[in-house]
Amino acid sequence: MISFGNVSALQAAMPQARNEILNEGKLSIGGKEYTINAATQEFTRANPTSGAVARFFEATGKLFREGSTQSVAKAITKAVFDNEQGQAQRLQTSSSVEHGQMLFKDANLKTPSDVLNAFAKLDSKMVKSHAAELSQLAERAMTEVMLETDSGKNLKALIGDDAVKSLAVRVVKDYGGGVAAAQKNPEVRINQMQAVFDMEVMHLKAAQRHIEGLASTDLNQGVYAEGLPEDAFNKAGVTNNVERAAAWIINASNSKGNDAENITSLLKEYATNGKDLLNMDNLKELHARLVPNVERDYRGPNISGGTLPSSIGGEGMLKQHIEGFLKENPVADKDLGKHLFAGVIGYHGFTDGNGRMGRMLYAIAELRNDSFNPLAMNAENSLHGIK
């Protein structure tokens, strides 16, 4: 067994002796054995002397020599676990409960809500010395709580497990309030974030009803068939369908610096390369080439009166739409472009360039059918349904 005469000797041996102590699972200080409780990252006195009288004299002698058994155990715990290596181990745990049990030294924490409630007991010294880790733990626990709410479960049913987890992390970071909120009243923040999730569900379901409803609609008549006059977008009077499509995409975009050469090149390539347009990875690849250097990687849920969902929720719905709904409910080749246009813009699954991407896919589908019919604004609005 690894042995030290006193706590000071242990402290002097750190951090070199740390791994050996962890592998051993125990150590001796002043002739007394202490074992590791892995669940709480702490040491406890092992095999105390039997008999009440003997334990009394042991404790009394220990107290006079170097403090109580409990204080020695705390000092060992601090030396071995209150460092970067101990923090790294805590951050690698699989849940906020495991993390919280280790950081707060409390095996009675059984749920993420228990972890959040434990923040109320923190003193200012602990908050200051472990600020970054406490912030991560608070966000982690709030995220796990959110996923178990009815709002979280409803959102998961729409966009899937991975997407709802990603969105929960972002929402908690934006609205959770961190350590201060966890200390004060985490339930208030949880309720507020549930309202954000509920708005997201409402927007996604509204988009889903509209977009999937197009599958039972004749898109070759009425407003859906309205075309844009040639002179409204084709100022140069080009006659090649690829060039006409490029002119239409550029004319409709509000973004500055559209690369006409790049758009034309992509149209030529995808018109003949046969890549599956009902594959999300293929769409992401095309989007990255069409809209390079996107400045942001996330658009949050709309809570200020608009109807757009978050980019994460929108992407999740778009993936399910093209890889699930449209494959299970196939549409005519001549209508595929309109359905892709509606899905990309209606769900708004990219952080930027949704309009360009929707028009690009519409144009590619048209070109694969050896035609190009430019959509009028009324047709576009009726297809994507965004108010």
Curated annotation (Swiss-Prot):
InterPro entries with a match to the protein in the record: Fido, Fido-like_dom_sf, VopS_N
Pfam family membership, one: Fic
GO biological process: symbiont-mediated perturbation of host small GTPase-mediated signal transduction
UniProt effect for mutating residue 354 to A: Abolishes adenylyltransferase activity
Disruption phenotype: Abolishes the ability to inhibit host Rho family GTPases and cause cytoskeletal disruption.
One of the record's GO molecular function terms: small GTPase binding
GO cellular component terms attached to this protein's record: extracellular region
Positions of the Fido domain: 278-387
Effect of substituting residue 356 to A: Abolishes adenylyltransferase activity
Keyword Repeat: no
Binding site for ATP: 76-77, 122-124, 353-355, 359
Alphabetic keyword roster: ATP-binding, Nucleotide-binding, Nucleotidyltransferase, Secreted, Transferase, Virulence
Subcellular location: Secreted
This enzyme's EC code(s): 2.7.7.108
Presence of the UniProt keyword Zinc in the record: no
Swiss-Prot/TrEMBL catalytic activity: L-tyrosyl-[protein] + ATP = O-(5'-adenylyl)-L-tyrosyl-[protein] + diphosphate; L-threonyl-[protein] + ATP = 3-O-(5'-adenylyl)-L-threonyl-[protein] + diphosphate
Function: Adenylyltransferase involved in virulence by mediating the addition of adenosine 5'-monophosphate (AMP) to specific threonine residue of host Rho GTPases RhoA, Rac and Cdc42. The resulting AMPylation prevents the interaction of Rho GTPases with downstream effectors, thereby inhibiting actin assembly in infected cells.
Domain notes: The fido domain mediates the adenylyltransferase activity.
Name the record gives this protein: Protein adenylyltransferase VopS
Naturally occurring in which organism (per UniProt): Vibrio parahaemolyticus serotype O3:K6 (strain RIMD 2210633)
